[in-house]
From Swiss-Prot:
Topology of the protein relative to the lipid bilayer: Multi-pass membrane protein
InterPro entries the record matches: CcmF_C (IPR032523), Cyt_c_assembly (IPR002541), Cyt_c_biogenesis (IPR003567), Cyt_c_biogenesis_CcmF (IPR003568), Cyt_c_biogenesis_NrfE (IPR003570), CytC_NO3Rdtase_biogenesis_NrfE (IPR017563)
Compartments it resides in: Cell inner membrane
Keywords tagged on the record: Cell inner membrane, Cell membrane, Cytochrome c-type biogenesis, Membrane, Transmembrane, Transmembrane helix
Name listed for the protein in its UniProt record: Cytochrome c-type biogenesis protein NrfE
Biological-process GO terms, alphabetical: cytochrome complex assembly
Job description of the protein: Required for the biogenesis of c-type cytochromes. Possible subunit of a heme lyase.
Family affiliation: Belongs to the CcmF/CycK/Ccl1/NrfE/CcsA family.
Annotated Pfam families: CcmF_C (PF16327), Cytochrom_C_asm (PF01578)
Parts forming coiled coils: none
Source organism per UniProt: Haemophilus influenzae (strain ATCC 51907 / DSM 11121 / KW20 / Rd)
Transmembrane segments: 6-26, 38-58, 93-113, 128-148, 167-187, 209-229, 239-259, 273-293, 311-331, 351-371, 390-410, 421-441, 452-472, 483-503, 570-590, 607-627
Length: 635
């Protein structure tokens, strides 16, 4: 009975979204305040119905209701409870319902925080959000219904994909979804501004907070996903340029460009067209990312639920939204009432312009690298893969230029270069070069198999330089309004340092070891002490115990595993990891060779944790910027 109630609530949500899309529009056309104001209760009804619907689905997982086909396909009675709840969004149907639930939260938040603002503009935006909600609700009802019954019900479920049975995957997809769909708010606001022929400057400040929060969630989601890929997939890396990874990167890059463009638009009235364009593109690429994950058109280690028909419906939604949005943008672009604003190239705004160009190039390059294989195959030209060499060759000069640009912009005051600041920034380059050289030399000294990389040295030097200049420029007087920017820019530098050191100067070796055998990697010796078999809640495990010494002194115990999941008949490696400030030791357990002998891959990843720290620092930068913006609005 409860699943039927969940389906009824989904129907109610669809109906409320339909009326939200139509009633305020009719009220705006007739200038009827009652119909205009109906946007608010309809928004809350949609949110309540969606929340209760996904809550009932989660409850069905918790109580092992295998009469639901979706629950039977993605859960098992032996699965720990918190993984049962996480399985709610572990497959296609549940993840789309969670997508809609996330959208409903943004809808309710926008309605609540704009209940006292311009009712006409807010109602128009809510109506457009209602249209988006209606489109996805209909898609779920007809193509992705998670409440379908199965008779006779199986005695046991198929279990959750073992790759998803991880704490990181409980939070990673929801954070990404919240970040993705948050861009729907600025999408609706920009369309409303186009409908009323307003410039982006008129809504820039109110829009910036929504973009900051969306970008904040997307940043945390990407960082958490990279961390999960690092310790769960067992290949020693953290970013594979996988299509699904790229699907989250593209709206992240566009959101970053939008944030900077909004600042220039708000303060100086420049880049209004850029701001509107980035606002529309950020959400459009979020929908495109959903297509990538769910269509099966692109092969991905993340695309666990594949269905071409569903994917093509999502692609249709993408084309309809983009056609309407950019058609309106094209119509209004030439008729905007915005007056011309004097623009100085040597200024903060000039730096933002160059940054936006670089971020646009990065997004377009990522898009081409992601979709070119699909186009190649669609044209019957065969199959082709685009991997890390392509993306690295594109992103190295872009990141280099961005790091240099960030330092140069810090030397601009009142529309011109400050000679004193330039000289001092130049002096800080010297210790940056020395420190970068020492960091690389230390790794080369510890492992003679490593080689010097000029590209890595350049990036490392620039990242350290940016960190030094940012801290030096602001250490005497840190204003709350700029504290978020300082944190975010320091985060960029720290992420770059972690990526360069772990990517270029990490060590790894593949070996076969039996108990009581050892292997040396750099200054570490890995001693395989013993082997045991263990039983988990829904798996059996082969466990190896390693004692690690550093320069002859006891350092750590590391315990990798190989788990066999009986229901799914899948074997997964659980990485053994010892992490620290200066680097991680990382063991991946491979195939069994009998009598406790296995193949292993041993890794040392210097400064890998700086990646996660830098990403979290960027997220905190966005959070403090939200607080700073809120204080300004209260004044």
């Amino acid at each position: 009975m409860l699943p039927e109630l969940g389906f009824f609530l989904l129907l109610l949500a669809t109906a409320s979204a339909f009326f939200l899309a139509l009633v305020p529009q009719f009220g705006l056309f007739k200038k009827n305040p009652t119909l205009i104001n109906a946007a608010w209760p309809l928004s809350y009804i949609f949110t309540l119905a969606t929340t209760l619907s996904i809550g009932l689905l989660a409850y069905s997982f918790a109580v092992d209701d295998f009469t639901l086909e979706y629950v039977a396909a993605h859960s098992n009675s032996q699965l720990p409870t918190f993984f049962k709840v996480a399985a709610t969004w572990g497959g296609h149907e549940g993840s789309m319902l969670f997508w809609l639930f996330s959208l409903s939260l943004w809808l309710a938040a926008f309605a609540f925080f704009n209940r006292k603002n311009d009712r006409t503009f807010s109602a128009q935006s809510l109506s457009l959000l209602g249209l988006i909600c209606f489109g996805f609700a209909v898609f779920i009802l007809f193509y992705s219904n998670p409440f379908g019954r199965i008779f006779p019900a199986p005695a046991e479920g198929r279990d959750l994909n073992p790759m998803l049975q991880d704490v990181g995957l409980i939070f990673h997809p929801p954070l990404l979804y919240v970040g993705y769909v948050g861009f729907a708010v600025n999408f609706a606001m920009s369309l409303s501004a186009l409908i009323y022929n307003q410039s982006a400057r008129q809504i820039a400040r109110s829009m910036r907070g929504w973009v900051l929060v969306s970008w904040l969630f997307l940043t945390i989601g990407i960082v958490l996903g990279a961390w999960w890929a690092y310790y769960e997939l067992g290949w020693g890396g953290w970013w594979f340029w996988d299509p699904v990874e790229n699907a989250s990167l593209m709206p992240w890059l566009l959101g970053l460009a939008l944030l900077h463009s909004l600042m220039a638009t708000e303060k100086q009235g420049v880049f209004s067209y850029w701001t509107t364009l980035f606002s529309l593109l950020a959400f459009a690429f979020s929908v495109l990312g959903t297509f990538i994950v769910r269509s099966g058109a692109l092969t991905s280690v993340h695309a666990f639920a594949l269905d071409n028909t569903r994917g093509y419906v999502l692609l249709l939604i993408f084309f309809v939204l983009t056609a309407l949005a950019f058609g309106l943008f094209a119509l209004r672009a030439g008729s905007s009432s915005e007056s011309a604003v004097k623009f100085q190239f040597i200024s903060k705004s000039g730096g933002i312009l160059l940054l936006n160009i670089l971020l646009t190039i990065a997004t377009v390059s990522t898009f081409l690298g992601t979709f070119y294989p699909m186009l190649f195959q669609a044209m019957n030209w065969g199959s082709i893969s685009v991997g890390s060499p392509y993306f690295n060759s594109i992103f190295f000069p872009i990141i280099t230029a961005i790091l240099i640009l960030m330092v140069i912009v810090l030397s601009i005051r009142k529309g011109q270069f400050d000679r004193t600041l330039l000289i001092r920034c130049g002096w800080l380059l010297i210790p940056s070069l020395i420190l970068a050289g020492l960091m690389i030399w230390q790794q080369l000294r510890n492992n003679s198999a490593l080689h010097f990389h000029a590209f890595a040295f350049v990036l490392l030097t620039l990242a350290i330089w940016l960190l030094f200049v940012t801290l030096w420029q602001n250490w005497r007087q840190i204003r709350l309004s700029q504290f978020g920017m300082i944190l975010a820019h320091c985060g960029v530098a720290i992420v770059t340092i972690g990526a360069v050191m772990s990517g270029y100067f990490g060590s790894e070796i593949g070996v076969r070891l039996a108990p009581q055998q050892s292997q040396t990697l750099g200054q570490y010796e890995f001693h395989y002490r013993q082997f045991s078999n263990e039983i988990g809640p829904n798996f059996t495990a082969e466990v190896a115990f390693f004692d690690v010494t550093k320069n002859g002194k006891p350092y750590a115990e590391i315990i990798p595993e190989r788990r066999y999941y009986d229901v799914r008949t899948m074997t997964m490696s659980e990485v053994g990891l010892d992490g620290g400030f200066w680097g991680d030791l990382y063991i991946v357990m491979g195939d069994s060779l009998g009598k406790g002998e296995f193949t292993f891959r041993l890794h040392y990843k210097p400064l890998i944790r700086w990646l996660w720290a830098g990403g979290i620092l960027m997220a905190f930068g966005a959070l403090f910027s939200v607080f700073g913006l809120r204080r300004k609005q209260e004044k």
